[in-house]
Structures are given as structure tokens and as C-alpha cells.
Amino acid sequence: MNLYTVIFINILLSLTLILVAFWLPQMNLYSEKANPYECGFDPTSSARLPFSMKFFLVAITFLLFDLEIALLLPLPWAIQTIKTSTMMIMAFILVTILSLGLAYEWTQKGLEWTE
């Protein structure tokens, strides 16, 4: 199989699954489905508590930087490649992007917990 056939099959399968996912579900909204569930009992307090947006932004920032660090984990194995200079340039670019993102978050006070 050549590469174009594999790509075409992947795109076709993806589009088919997306279309089936949109057509299959029947959106029957019941009031019971919208109510919060707390271990079979009626909730003791409101389930719609305010959520700290600052916590959400710090959590998203952590996930982004954690993903970038996970991209650096294969570097020890990549050093064994034939094109070591290309690997080092790509690693340097990735670390630079990570550092610029951290500097931007720091200057915008995105890492400050209190305001």
C-alpha cells in the first residue's frame, strides 16, 4: 500500500465516524438528566458552585508546559540518530518555545496566584 492510499483510508474512516456520531444520538433532554447526582441522594448544596478562573488558567498552563516537557523525554534516544545536528536544533527550538511561553506567562502575571 502506498502512502496516499493509507492517508485516504484514514481520512475516509475519520469522516465516516464523525458523520455517524452526529447522526446517531437522539437528543432527548430530561429534567432528571440535568440534575446533579450525589451518590443516590439529593444534593446537600448547590452543584453550580463558582469556579475560580485563576485556578483554571493555571491548570491549563500546567497542562501545556507538561505536554512540552513530555515532548523532550525522547531526546536521549534521539541523540543516537545519524543527524545529531538536526535533532539538537529541533530540541533547541522546542526549549526556546517553552522558555518564551514561560517568560510570557511570567510577564503577564499568569503565574501569580493572588491578585
UniProtKB/Swiss-Prot annotation:
EC id: 7.1.1.2
Role according to the record: Core subunit of the mitochondrial membrane respiratory chain NADH dehydrogenase (Complex I) which catalyzes electron transfer from NADH through the respiratory chain, using ubiquinone as an electron acceptor. Essential for the catalytic activity of complex I.
Lineage: Eukaryota, Metazoa, Chordata, Craniata, Vertebrata
Keyword Transmembrane listed: yes
GO CC, alphabetical: mitochondrial inner membrane; mitochondrion; respiratory chain complex I
GO terms classed as biological process: aerobic respiration; cellular response to glucocorticoid stimulus; mitochondrial electron transport, NADH to ubiquinone; proton motive force-driven mitochondrial ATP synthesis; response to light intensity; response to oxidative stress
Membrane-spanning segments: 3-23, 55-75, 86-106
Organism whose genome encodes this protein: Mus musculus (Mouse)
This protein's UniProt keywords: Electron transport, Membrane, Mitochondrion, Mitochondrion inner membrane, NAD, Respiratory chain, Translocase, Transmembrane, Transmembrane helix, Transport, Ubiquinone
Membrane topology of this protein: Multi-pass membrane protein
Gene: mt-Nd3
Record-given protein name: NADH-ubiquinone oxidoreductase chain 3
Subunit (UniProt): Core subunit of respiratory chain NADH dehydrogenase (Complex I) which is composed of 45 different subunits. Interacts with TMEM186. Interacts with TMEM242.
Main location: mitochondrion
